[in-house]
Amino acid sequence: MDSTKEKCDSYKDDLLLRMGLNDNKAGMEGLDKEKINKIIMEATKGSRFYGNELKKEKQVNQRIENMMQQKAQITSQQLRKAQLQVDRFAMELEQSRNLSNTIVHIDMDAFYAAVEMRDNPELKDKPIAVGSMSMLSTSNYHARRFGVRAAMPGFIAKRLCPQLIIVPPNFDKYRAVSKEVKEILADYDPNFMAMSLDEAYLNITKHLEERQNWPEDKRRYFIKMGSSVENDNPGKEVNKLSEHERSISPLLFEESPSDVQPPGDPFQVNFEEQNNPQILQNSVVFGTSAQEVVKEIRFRIEQKTTLTASAGIAPNTMLAKVCSDKNKPNGQYQILPNRQAVMDFIKDLPIRKVSGIGKVTEKMLKALGIITCTELYQQRALLSLLFSETSWHYFLHISLGLGSTHLTRDGERKSMSVERTFSEINKAEEQYSLCQELCSELAQDLQKERLKGRTVTIKLKNVNFEVKTRASTVSSVVSTAEEIFAIAKELLKTEIDADFPHPLRLRLMGVRISSFPNEEDRKHQQRSIIGFLQAGNQALSATECTLEKTDKDKFVKPLEMSHKKSFFDKKRSERKWSHQDTFKCEAVNKQSFQTSQPFQVLKKKMNENLEISENSDDCQILTCPVCFRAQGCISLEALNKHVDECLDGPSISENFKMFSCSHVSATKVNKKENVPASSLCEKQDYEAHPKIKEISSVDCIALVDTIDNSSKAESIDALSNKHSKEECSSLPSKSFNIEHCHQNSSSTVSLENEDVGSFRQEYRQPYLCEVKTGQALVCPVCNVEQKTSDLTLFNVHVDVCLNKSFIQELRKDKFNPVNQPKESSRSTGSSSGVQKAVTRTKRPGLMTKYSTSKKIKPNNPKHTLDIFFK
């Protein structure tokens, strides 16, 4: 009977510890905790919050019970082994101790409440809190004497202090004041780390070094009267102190009374300032030590905002945070930068004072008899066996007085969210409406930061304080309110349907977006063929703009680039080089080039014409984007009809002129350089020249029409016979190879289907056909313009190009290589048929024909556009 009663009393004490007052905050020393906790328990008993706290307390007690059982099973041998391991780690930490930095933690005193009291002087001597009846953000020091503190429900605070005035928050005003404070902090450390609106870390080590050589004039500031305008520039006028400032400011300067100048001392004040009756010529000269620098910071903050700040000075961030709470409000504390001073400070420090140790960890450590940091160090071996590696590492850092000395500012954001707490909402319409509001607010925040994400998460807390999070990841990034709400609505609908027929009773809802693409993802993200063509088009435009300023010898040739580059980088490089050939052709054959200008130049002229036509008040003169001819004042329907006609019959002669120009340019450059070209016919030849860098590019099926359909076979035979001596033997390879673009008298540009030639050049330009990009679609593999605007047919062509190597192997097995068909131009329909045949056939035996240095083919030989762009 007695044991049951003792157990009940112990459980009640544990609940009081969890739900009772946490007095580890400035201004709450010496309070009657028993009386305050009794009021808190009476105000919450029977509520859902009380029931939720009971459930959490049971969970914590269960964890402690499991921990004590684990402790009982630890042997002395395990303890000795753990002791050696922890001591070895402690020795490493001790050797890495860094005492060379001076870290300052600035914390504004009761920031939100202080701003409200400044703007409404009637509140100065009254207990006030900022927040609502549901939750308080902060309280002033008058209210703290009654036990009212931040993170306390307003209705409980009213029980503790009936005369408490609760002021609604005004975050725009708080942000404006915070900006003023941060402007001052940036003068001492441009890379300071802001933790919130009222809290920041500074590393003033560099400032202290520079300050040693500063004259007094640079360290002098004047004390102002009630004006909140700060005297940033030393040597300017000052006004009289207000009564409030007189009661605060002198405390800052007790250690340096000789620095205060008596009234009437000119001290670099000009004649007008001396004769101004509003000026009280009190100036303060701050020293060069860390203490003096922090006094100066706090003085400037007070002069500019009329608000006070507390500060901690220490060798690392952990100690500086604890020090700033030591002499609150309006005070500062320093730990000298030596090991003995650090250990003396840590010795009797309660573990709850350290940031990162909350009420649950405090209770678990208390069950092991650990209350101070000294006891934390004494039990280090036991803690390493009972807690996770991350936890006991952190405990050991605390017990040795170690912390971070590196301030990281504006790290990469991982997510952005918005959430609201409210009274119970159980109607689906209201829940959807609230979700839409949250999505709109989140979209605005994303727009300000210029962020987009792929994962949308909703957070729901029901009336029983049970929290659920549901997430959905989409393939493309989203950022608008409509896109986010479309995803969040489905997630919310799933939860509503899960509770049907009972309503979903919520008291909190939040929406979060994450999975932001990083810089590397944004750089290489290619999701569609259109996107690929646009990217290539932009690359060509950039090349055209910078080509005149760049020496031709400084260009990086495609065959000399690194093998490690991606396929898209290689293709862009080839297209850039092809465009460079076209530009050189303009210098060599200026007259002939005028009749066939490069596409980008024509496009530029077209854009200029469009801009002129848009600004015209008369009828618009439209230009065809295909033939680039002005169409006069015609309707959009007529222009569309004309564009369709142009797309059905492109100018082949112009295309051939561009090709011929590119070939002539490349030939002349090679003649100038007199660099011999050697064919890559054997592997030994490649190994004999290891310094030569090569890039292979596929020579896929061209699928282009010739001018005269009746001369297809003859043109192919002519090409094959003319260059049979120049080309190497066909090498079966998965790598991509670059083939010569030959000048042909029949004005036919075609590539053989079955022959994959490999080609190498030593430090010379490759022959590349002119790549024409723009309105028409160009295959990203073979760089051949397709005479179709149908994306389905275009995709079929790309599939055929991607599967060329499989088609070749299949055809070599089924047919005699000597009697291969000579037609190089096939319709897209037949290409589709070949593609289907390839996807139905697996030829694992063909892998043995490849060199061991080649990449192993996956089990599924089917190449799709989705895989290609991944």
Curated annotation (Swiss-Prot):
Region (Disordered): 816-858
The protein's Enzyme Commission number: 2.7.7.7
UmuC domain residues: 103-358
Comment on pH dependence: Optimum pH is 6.5-7.5.
Catalytic activity reported: DNA(n) + a 2'-deoxyribonucleoside 5'-triphosphate = DNA(n+1) + diphosphate
Chain positions recorded as Zn(2+) 1 binding sites: 624, 627, 642, 646
Ion transport as UniProt keyword: no
Binding site for Zn(2+) 2: 779, 782, 797, 801
Subcellular localization, as worded in the UniProt entry: Nucleus
Zinc finger intervals, UBZ4-type: 621-651, 776-806
Protein name per UniProt: DNA polymerase kappa
Record carries keyword Cell inner membrane: no
Species this protein is from: Homo sapiens
Main location: nucleus
UniProt temperature dependence: Optimum temperature is 37 degrees Celsius.
One GO location term (cellular component): nucleus
GO terms assigned for molecular function: damaged DNA binding; DNA-directed DNA polymerase activity; zinc ion binding
Binding site for Mg(2+): 107, 198-199
Assembly, per entry: Interacts with REV1. Interacts with PCNA.
Tissue: Detected at low levels in testis, spleen, prostate and ovary. Detected at very low levels in kidney, colon, brain, heart, liver, lung, placenta, pancreas and peripheral blood leukocytes.
Cross-referenced InterPro entries: DNA/RNA_pol_sf, DNA_pol_Y-fam_lit_finger_sf, DNA_pol_Y-fam_little_finger, DNA_polymerase-Y, DNApol_IV, PolY_HhH_motif, Rad18_UBZ4, Rev_trsase/Diguanyl_cyclase
Domain remarks in the Swiss-Prot or TrEMBL record: The catalytic core consists of fingers, palm and thumb subdomains, but the fingers and thumb subdomains are much smaller than in high-fidelity polymerases; residues from five sequence motifs of the Y-family cluster around an active site cleft that can accommodate DNA and nucleotide substrates with relaxed geometric constraints, with consequently higher rates of misincorporation and low processivity.
